[in-house]
C-alpha cells in the first residue's frame, strides 16, 4: 500500500473516532452508530483507536467492548472484551428464551442490581455531590466521576452485577449475526439501568455480508435498528489487499455480481478430487458448506494420520456428578454443554475428540490455529506455533450438580463456513456443493470462503459451482443488499431525471 494512501486511511479512522467521541459527549440519549467495511478495511483497528481515545480522556469506565461471538472477541484483542451475552450476564436459559421469558429471567437474576439502581436514581443529586470538587449537579452517565460513583454504589449489592451498567459507549462487533430478538433483549437490559433523559450509544461494527443468524427476523430485517441509527460510516481502504484484482472480484459477490475476472480466476484454481483427498496438502484447512462433508473429510484425515504413525491422543472430558437439590439429569447436562460449547460437545461424542501429535487444532475461545504437540500431564495439553508453545489446562464448567472439565481444543483439518467467518488463513481449500449451489440456504458461504485469503494463489477449489458465468447471482437477499447500501454505505436512492 502506498504511504499516502495508508496515511489517508489512518486520517479517515481518526476522524471517525473524533466524530463518535463528539457525538457521545453531546448526545445524552439513546442512539446507534454503524461502522462497516470489507474484511481488512481496519474496523477492528478503528475500534481499538476509539477505546484508546476514551482511555486517554479518562473515560475508560464509560466503555463496554463486546462482540457477538467468542471468535470475534479474540480478533479484537482487547483485554476487557467479552461477548455481549457475558456483558449482560445472560445465562444459557436467557439466551434461548423468547422475549417475554427473557424479561422475567433478567429481572429475577438481577433483582438486587435493579433495586440498587432505583435507589441510585432517587438519590442521583446527592450522589453527584459525594466527590469534593465535582461540578455535576446530578449524576451524568457521560461523566467518568459520576460513572465511578455509580459503580461504587452498585458494588454494594451482595451478588455480581452486569458489567455494562452505566458504560454508555456500548460497542458490539460482528453485529450482522444479531437477530431482532437479540437486539430487543439488549435494549431491554439497558432500559433497566438508565438515568432520566440519559441513555446508551450502541456502536455496531461489522457487516450483514456474512452467513445469516438462525433466528428470524435478522438484524437487517427489523425497523428497530433503523429507528436507532444516528450515524453510519463505511471504511473503504483495504489494508491487507495483496491481490487487488482478486479482492475486487470477490468483494462484488456482496452485491450479487459475478464478473469475468472472478469466473476466470476461480476456474483456474479448481483442483477437482484433490480437494477432498486427505493426503493432498493435508496441512491446508478445508472449508465445507455442510457438516456431513466436513465430518467425512475429518474421518479420512484421521485414517491418514494413523497410517503415518502419528501419536493418537483421545481427549475425553471428565464429568463428575456432585449432586445437590438442583441436580439435573445427565441428558440435560449434555444438552447444556452442546449449546454452550458446540465446537467440542455433541450428543453423539459427548465431548470426546481424537487429535494427533503434529496435527492442527483450534483453541477456544479465540479459535486460533496451533500445532498439537501432546499432553504434558493428564490436565495439561501442549500446543504451539512458530512464536512458541502454549500450555493449556482443562476448562471447568459447573452446571446443576455436575462438574465438567475438558481441554478447549478441537481438530481443524476441516471446518464449516460458519467456523471460517472471521478467519484469515495462509491457504484454503474450499469444497462447495457441486450441484444446485443457488438452492443452498447458506449461499453466502462462497463469499465467506473466498475472502479468508489475501491472494488468488492461496485458494484452491474442488469445483466452481457458485461463479460459473458472468452476471447476477443470489448469494445475498435483495432486501439485505438494500440495508447494506442504505444503512452501512449511506447510499441515498434517487430517481433518474432522464
UniProtKB/Swiss-Prot annotation:
Record: residues binding ATP: 37-44
Alphabetized Gene3D superfamilies for the sequence: P-loop containing nucleotide triphosphate hydrolases
Keyword field: ATP-binding, Helicase, Hydrolase, Nucleotide-binding
Database matches in InterPro entries: P-loop_NTPase (IPR027417)
SUPFAM superfamilies noted in UniProt: P-loop containing nucleoside triphosphate hydrolases
A GO molecular-function descriptor: ATP binding
Highest rank taxon of the organism: Viruses
EC number: 3.6.4.-
Broad enzyme group: hydrolase
Protein name: Probable ATP-dependent helicase 25
Organism: Ictalurid herpesvirus 1 (strain Auburn)
Organismal lineage: Viruses, Duplodnaviria, Heunggongvirae, Peploviricota, Herviviricetes
Amino acid at each position: 500500500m502506498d504511504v499516502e494512501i495508508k496515511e489517508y486511511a489512518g486520517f479517515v479512522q481518526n476522524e471517525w473516532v473524533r466524530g463518535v467521541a463528539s457525538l457521545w459527549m453531546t448526545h445524552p440519549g439513546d442512539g446507534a452508530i454503524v461502522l462497516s467495511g470489507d474484511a481488512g478495511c481496519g474496523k477492528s483497528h478503528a475500534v481499538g483507536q476509539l477505546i484508546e481515545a476514551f482511555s486517554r480522556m479518562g473515560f475508560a469506565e464509560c466503555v463496554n467492548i463486546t462482540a457477538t461471538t467468542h471468535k470475534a472477541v479474540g480478533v479484537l484483542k482487547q483485554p476487557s472484551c467479552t461477548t455481549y451475552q457475558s456483558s449482560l450476564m445472560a445465562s444459557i436459559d436467557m439466551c434461548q428464551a423468547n422475549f417475554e421469558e427473557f424479561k422475567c429471567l433478567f429481572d429475577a437474576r438481577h433483582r438486587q442490581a435493579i433495586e440498587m439502581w432505583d435507589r441510585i436514581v432517587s438519590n442521583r443529586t446527592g450522589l453527584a455531590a459525594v466527590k469534593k470538587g465535582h461540578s455535576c449537579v446530578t449524576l451524568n452517565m457521560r461523566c467518568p466521576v459520576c460513572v465511578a460513583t455509580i459503580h461504587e454504589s452498585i458494588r454494594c449489592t451482595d451478588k455480581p452485577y452486569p458489567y455494562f451498567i452505566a458504560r454508555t459507549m456500548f460497542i458490539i462487533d460482528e453485529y450482522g449475526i444479531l437477530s431482532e430478538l437479540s437486539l430487543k433483549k439488549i435494549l431491554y437490559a439497558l432500559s433497566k439501568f438508565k438515568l432520566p433523559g440519559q441513555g446508551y450509544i450502541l456502536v455496531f461494527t461489522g457487516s450483514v455480508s456474512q452467513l445469516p443468524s438462525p433466528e428470524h427476523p435478522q438484524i437487517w430485517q427489523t425497523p428497530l435498528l433503523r429507528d436507532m441509527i444516528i450515524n453510519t460510516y463505511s471504511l473503504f481502504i483495504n489494508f491487507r489487499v495483496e491481490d487487488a484484482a482478486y479482492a475486487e472480484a470477490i468483494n462484488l459477490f456482496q452485491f450479487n455480481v459475478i464478473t469475468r475476472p472472478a469466473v476466470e480466476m476461480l476456474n483456474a484454481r479448481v483442483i477437482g478430487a484433490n480437494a477432498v483427498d486427505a493426503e493432498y496438502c493435508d496441512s491446508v484447512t478445508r472449508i465445507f458448506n455442510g457438516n456431513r462433508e466436513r465430518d467425512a473429510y475429518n474421518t479420512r484425515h484421521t485414517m491418514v494420520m494413523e497410517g503415518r504413525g502419528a501419536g493418537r491422543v483421545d481427549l475425553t472430558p471428565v464429568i463428575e456428578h456432585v449432586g445437590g437439590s438442583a441436580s439435573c439429569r445427565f441428558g440435560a447436562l449434555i444438552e447444556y454443554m452442546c449449546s454452550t460449547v458446540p465446537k467440542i460437545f455433541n450428543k453423539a461424542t459427548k465431548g470426546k475428540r481424537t487429535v494427533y501429535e503434529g496435527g492442527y487444532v483450534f483453541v477456544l475461545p479465540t479459535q486460533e490455529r496451533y500445532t498439537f504437540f501432546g499432553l504434558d500431564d493428564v490436565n495439561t495439553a501442549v500446543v504451539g506455533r512458530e512464536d512458541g508453545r502454549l500450555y493449556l489446562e482443562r476448562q471447568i464448567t459447573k452446571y446443576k450438580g455436575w462438574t465438567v472439565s475438558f481441554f478447549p481444543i478441537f481438530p481443524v483439518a476441516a471446518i464449516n463456513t460458519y467456523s471460517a467467518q472471521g478467519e484469515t488463513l495462509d491457504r484454503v481449500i474450499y469444497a462447495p456443493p457441486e450441484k444446485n449451489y443457488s438452492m443452498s440456504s447458506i449461499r453466502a458461504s462462497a463469499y465467506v470462503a473466498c475472502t479468508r485469503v489475501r491472494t488468488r494463489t492461496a485458494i484452491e477449489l474442488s469445483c466452481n459451482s457458485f461463479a460459473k458465468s458472468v452476471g447476477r447471482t443470489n448469494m445475498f437477499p435483495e432486501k439485505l443488499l438494500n440495508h447494506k447500501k442504505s444503512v452501512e454505505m449511506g447510499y441515498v436512492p434517487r430517481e433518474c431525471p432522464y
